[in-house]
Amino acid sequence: SATSLTFQLAYLVKKIDFDYTPNWGRGTPSSYIDNLTFPKVLTDKKYSYRVVVNGSDLGVESNFAVTPSGGQTINFLQYNKGYGVADTKTIQVFVVIPDTGNSEEYIIAEWKKT
């Protein structure tokens, strides 16, 4: 269960402070999603992010600065040749664990038009 996993992690790590609640940033026109901001990310390693749109892999990028407050913005324009992603498409963002050759990754956010 999520509860048991949380306590197991608390036992092993002791203190973790993060917030991966996705804040989707709209572009111009507002029917496009240009970025995604996580309020407070883990900073123990330099994580990369994979973006997948409607099942099409747009690649992995890693050069996103962490703000002094710990937030990080993933810029979709960097993945999509300078364009945002239409909000009618499904957007999946995966965090890629460094030093695994991009082989270990976990979905961290998903946009689905409702």
UniProtKB/Swiss-Prot annotation:
Give GO terms for biological process. Answer: regulation of immune system process
N-acetylserine PTM positions: S1
Q: Name one Pfam family in it.
A: Fve
Task: Keywords in alphabetical order, please.
Answer: Acetylation, Lectin
What are the protein's GO molecular function terms? carbohydrate binding
Give the matching InterPro entries: FIP_sf (IPR036344), Fungal_ImmunoLectin_sf (IPR053742), Immunomodulatory_FIP-Fve_fun (IPR015339)
**Would the keyword Acetylation turn up in this protein's UniProt record?**
yes
Q: Which Gene3D superfamilies match?
A: Fungal immunomodulatory protein Fve
Protein purpose: Lectin with specificity for complex cell-surface carbohydrates. Possesses immunomodulatory activity, stimulates lymphocyte mitogenesis, suppresses systemic anaphylaxis reactions and edema, enhances transcription of IL-2, IFN-gamma and TNF-alpha and hemagglutinates red blood cells.
Can you state the subunit structure given in the record? Homodimer.
Q: Which family does it belong to?
A: Belongs to the fungal immunomodulatory protein (FIP) family.
Protein name as it appears in the record: Immunomodulatory protein FIP-Fve
Species the sequence originates in? Flammulina velutipes (Agaricus velutipes)
